[in-house]
């Protein structure tokens, strides 16, 4: 069911830059450290307060999901561009996340690698989890956020692996938060992200099984 769980986003990763790992840096919040005299402690406190407000504002912005900007569906897509790379393609493949630098038709699965300005995400191809529109869109939104974050980075398999790894961690978080669950009807069921968590009701155990306290003999 590749067609059911795929998303294609436009990317601005650079094909011109050399494959240099040093060019890819995680986004960090810039902070200014100021050394002041004891008489200037009040100035430092004001700066710390302003920095805290900026960080809180940044956290609020991070909580807002990135709007989806899927590529418009194309017609009559044909597989092409593979010969230019000797039958290989730029990709990052993990258990639940497959990312390709190409446009993949969601219905016919035709693979057009000549459109390397697009990244296609195939989500959970083995259907290990149960997905609905909301949970799928959360993953797609996070994927879109990562694509935007790496704008200007070299288009290499290393960059795609960074994105894929972050998406895998995000899926794990969704599982632990109870936003998705294992598909018990999956063809292969091995709980790759840990066994399901089961909550027990201990009230019956403490009360002797019927919810009433036991009387002493």
From Swiss-Prot:
<feature type="compositionally biased region" description="Basic and acidic residues">
    <location>
        <begin position="50"/>
        <end position="62"/>
    </location>
</feature>
<comment type="function">
    <text>NDH shuttles electrons from NAD(P)H:plastoquinone, via FMN and iron-sulfur (Fe-S) centers, to quinones in the photosynthetic chain and possibly in a chloroplast respiratory chain. The immediate electron acceptor for the enzyme in this species is believed to be plastoquinone. Couples the redox reaction to proton translocation, and thus conserves the redox energy in a proton gradient.</text>
</comment>
<dbReference type="GO" id="GO:0010598">
    <property type="term" value="C:NAD(P)H dehydrogenase complex (plastoquinone)"/>
</dbReference>
<dbReference type="InterPro" id="IPR018922">
    <property type="entry name" value="NdhM"/>
</dbReference>
<dbReference type="Pfam" id="PF10664">
    <property type="entry name" value="NdhM"/>
</dbReference>
<keyword id="KW-0813">Transport</keyword>
<keyword id="KW-0520">NAD</keyword>
<dbReference type="GO" id="GO:0009535">
    <property type="term" value="C:chloroplast thylakoid membrane"/>
</dbReference>
<dbReference type="GO" id="GO:0009507">
    <property type="term" value="C:chloroplast"/>
</dbReference>
<protein>
    <recommendedName>
        <fullName>NAD(P)H-quinone oxidoreductase subunit M, chloroplastic</fullName>
        <ecNumber>7.1.1.-</ecNumber>
    </recommendedName>
</protein>
<keyword id="KW-1278">Translocase</keyword>
<dbReference type="GO" id="GO:0010258">
    <property type="term" value="P:NADH dehydrogenase complex (plastoquinone) assembly"/>
</dbReference>
<keyword id="KW-0874">Quinone</keyword>
<keyword id="KW-0472">Membrane</keyword>
<keyword id="KW-0521">NADP</keyword>
<keyword id="KW-0150">Chloroplast</keyword>
<feature type="transit peptide" description="Chloroplast">
    <location>
        <begin position="1"/>
        <end position="21"/>
    </location>
</feature>
<keyword id="KW-0934">Plastid</keyword>
<comment type="subunit">
    <text>Part of the chloroplast NDH complex, composed of a mixture of chloroplast and nucleus encoded subunits. Component of the NDH subcomplex A, at least composed of ndhH, ndhI, ndhJ, ndhK, ndhL, ndhM, ndhN and ndhO.</text>
</comment>
<comment type="similarity">
    <text>Belongs to the NDH complex subunit M family.</text>
</comment>
<dbReference type="GO" id="GO:0005886">
    <property type="term" value="C:plasma membrane"/>
</dbReference>
<dbReference type="GO" id="GO:0048038">
    <property type="term" value="F:quinone binding"/>
</dbReference>
<keyword id="KW-0793">Thylakoid</keyword>
<dbReference type="GO" id="GO:0016655">
    <property type="term" value="F:oxidoreductase activity, acting on NAD(P)H, quinone or similar compound as acceptor"/>
</dbReference>
<keyword id="KW-0618">Plastoquinone</keyword>
<keyword id="KW-0809">Transit peptide</keyword>
<feature type="region of interest" description="Disordered">
    <location>
        <begin position="48"/>
        <end position="67"/>
    </location>
</feature>
């Amino acid at each position: 069911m590749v067609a059911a769980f795929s998303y294609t986003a436009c990317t601005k990763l650079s094909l011109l830059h050399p494959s240099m790992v040093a060019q890819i840096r995680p986004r960090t919040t810039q902070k200014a450290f100021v050394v002041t005299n004891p008489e200037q402690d009040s100035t430092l406190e004001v700066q710390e307060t302003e920095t805290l407000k900026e960080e809180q504002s940044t956290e609020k912005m991070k909580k807002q999901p990135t709007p989806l900007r899927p590529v418009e569906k194309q017609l009559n897509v044909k597989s092409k561009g593979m010969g230019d790379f000797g039958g290989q393609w730029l990709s990052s493949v993990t258990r639940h996340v497959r990312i390709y630098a190409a446009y993949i038709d969601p219905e016919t699965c035709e693979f057009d690698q000549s459109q390397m300005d697009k990244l296609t995400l195939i989500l959970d191809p083995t259907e290990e989890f149960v997905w609905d529109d909301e949970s799928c869109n959360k993953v797609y939104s996070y994927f879109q956020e990562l694509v935007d974050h790496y704008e200007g980075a070299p288009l290499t398999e290393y960059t795609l692996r960074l994105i894929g790894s972050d998406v895998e961690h995000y899926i794990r978080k969704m599982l632990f938060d109870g936003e998705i669950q294992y598909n018990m009807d999956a063809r292969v069921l091995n709980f790759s992200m840990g066994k399901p968590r089961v909550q027990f009701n201990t009230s019956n155990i403490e009360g002797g099984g019927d919810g009433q306290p036991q009387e002493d003999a």
